[in-house]
Design a protein with these regions (language model features):
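Aromatic- and glycine-rich beta-strand/loop motifs that create alpha-glucan
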Residues: 2, 18-48
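Junction motif at the cytosolic side of a transmembrane helix
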Residues: 2-4, 228-244
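Transmembrane helix boundary and interhelical loop/hinge segments in multi-pass membrane proteins
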Residues: 38, 87-107, 120-121
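Hydrophobic alpha-helical transmembrane segments of multi-pass membrane transport/permease proteins
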Residues: 42-64, 80-82, 192-199, 225-231
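Hydrophobic alpha-helical transmembrane segments that constitute the membrane-spanning cores
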Residues: 47, 118-143, 163, 167, ...
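Membrane-interfacial helix-loop-helix connectors in multipass membrane proteins
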Residues: 62-73, 137-158, 176, 204-219, ...
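Long, hydrophobic alpha-helical segments
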Residues: 74-90
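A structural motif at transmembrane helix-loop-helix junctions in multipass membrane proteins
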Residues: 151, 156-190, 240-244
Length: 244
């Protein structure tokens, strides 16, 4: 706990030699704190992975063993599984710090709060997004996806899962402190996740049809860049409103 408190102080109070806050140091301090906290609750990470595996594994059992059909639905199933899995950890992105008053301390720190939110978003992706990217090719084998499709799946998820975390941070901030926040969060985010789902799964569908899929990846990348600049300050503003 002392190590965690120390990294929080580092995240909130890092200063340059002339007394100016160092946002990059604060972001890294927040990232380290979030990862240390994750080590104390490994079961939550396992829950995300188990849920992803279950979603991806139940569809072949329900659809049947026909290879052509499995290859057709595989990318969409894996994308839906990744989308739903990222939702599981979003309520805790700000919820626990809101409950114990830590968010108020962060707001009082000299570091721009958006940078601290950025550290939380990166930590969420490393814990709930990156493992899904690494696991997706293994699950893709049960759908009979060829190596080229598996490689494209990984590339699309590398663009799409950070986007899901960024958009999810806004939703988590907007529902902070509300009753039934988990259900409200899902209702709020699922429509916003649709473009990422369409472009991510569409890239693999285009590849399977022999069409150019670069446009889908370009759109995913453009959405990711826009979200990287907009999501942290928007989420920070929403958290500030919820606390004040």
């Amino acid at each position: 706990m002392k190590a965690i408190d120390g990294t929080l102080r580092q995240a909130g109070g890092s200063r340059a030699a002339h007394g100016e806050p160092r946002p990059a140091s604060a972001l890294l301090g927040m990232l380290r704190r979030e990862l240390l906290l994750t080590l104390r609750r490994r079961s939550e990470v396992a829950t995300v992975l188990v849920f992803f595996v279950l979603v991806a594994s139940l569809f072949p059992l329900a659809i049947g063993p026909e290879p052509a059909r499995l290859r057709a639905i595989g990318p969409g199933v894996l994308w839906v599984g990744a989308l739903l899995s990222t939702l599981l950890g979003l309520p805790r992105m700000f919820g626990e710090d809101y409950a114990d008053g830590t968010l108020e301390q962060m707001l009082l720190s000299p570091t721009p709060f958006a940078w601290l939110v950025g550290g939380k978003i990166i930590a969420h992706w490393l814990v709930a997004g990156l493992p899904l990217v690494l696991l997706a090719p293994v699950l893709g084998l049960q759908f009979g996806l060829p190596p080229a499709a598996l490689a494209l799946l990984v590339g699309a998820l590398l663009l799409g899962t950070p986007l899901l975390s960024l958009i999810g941070a806004i939703g988590a901030a907007l529902t902070l402190g509300t009753r039934g926040g988990g259900a409200l969060l899902a209702l709020l985010l699922l429509p916003l996740y649709v473009p990422a789902l369409v472009f991510g799964a569409g890239a693999l569908a285009a590849q399977a049809s022999g069409l150019d899929y670069s446009g889908y990846l370009s759109l995913l990348g453009a959405m990711l860049v826009v979200a990287m600049f907009l999501a942290p300050p928007v989420a920070a503003a929403a958290v500030r409103i919820a606390i004040e």
